Amino acid sequence: MPDFLSKNRVSELAALKQKKQRRAQGLCVLEGLRLITQLAADGILPKEVYLLDGEEALPALASVPAFICDQRALDRICDTEHPQGIAALYELPRSDFKGFRRAFYLDGISDPGNLGTIFRLSMAFGIDAVLLSEDCADPASPKVIRSSLGAVYKVPYAQMNPIALKLPGLKVVGTSAEGDTALHAFQPPARAPMLIVIGSEAHGVTPEVAKRCETMLRIEMAPGMESLNAAVAAGIVAHHLWVESLTS
């Protein structure tokens, strides 16, 4: 039978809610049966598992040390208001960024839910990497990992200064409601690496980044709509490019 989680250990795990502590230790606590099951299916196993008394351990995690805790302890170590009956301790996702053929550059995407969703749809639609401005949400935070359903562990990412957007041979395209090129008419380059810039819904692509874009793509919408959620816009663009790659 698993041991009970000690009070001292609960305090140590609760400290990982702070970004500084996560970075210092290279660890984070993730919760939820769906996320932990998906990570296990992807071959990503935790260092420890924490279960409410009466909950059964996952067969896929049979080799992982397990501990029993009460609801109060689970509430302390998890960053959600109503955590489910299972949590686990993971190493932070580490990017093995080497290059890309097609990538997103995220310009000020500060909402963790949007950022996680963009990682997830990047896996679905063949986006090789996600590059981030300095003011984006932390890709290694539990909220981002949870909303990505673990995709942050699979899609390479890196922080990137806008100055690097003008690398030789790199095609950079932005997105804007007032863009000069309709998305459906855009032909992606056959061989050159391409970077697709997604700005925040509130502010769009910043002027510093926009001036480095060769063209601005426009997602055509019904009258009366001014903008889309950043993750929704990213999904529409990524899906269009994915379909184009299948038919070209």
How would you label these PLM feature ranges?
Residues 1-54, 136-137:
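Boundary-proximal intrinsically disordered activation/regulatory segments immediately upstream
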Residues 2-4, 67-70, 155-163:
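Short acidic-hydrophobic, aromatic-tinged amphipathic segments that line or gate anion-handling sites
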Residues 32, 110-118, 226-232:
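Amphipathic alpha-helical repeat scaffolds
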Residues 34-36, 55-56, 73-74, 136-137, ...:
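Alpha-helix capping/helix-boundary segments
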Residues 41, 89-180:
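RNA substrate-binding interface of SAM-dependent RNA methyltransferases
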Residues 64-91:
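Glycine/small-residue-rich loop that forms an oxyanion/phosphate-binding "nest" at active or ligand-binding sites
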Residues 88, 121-125, 136-153, 207-248:
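Structured adenosyl-cofactor binding patch, chiefly the S-adenosyl-L-methionine
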Residues 174-225:
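Active-site/ligand-binding-proximal alpha/beta "capping" segment
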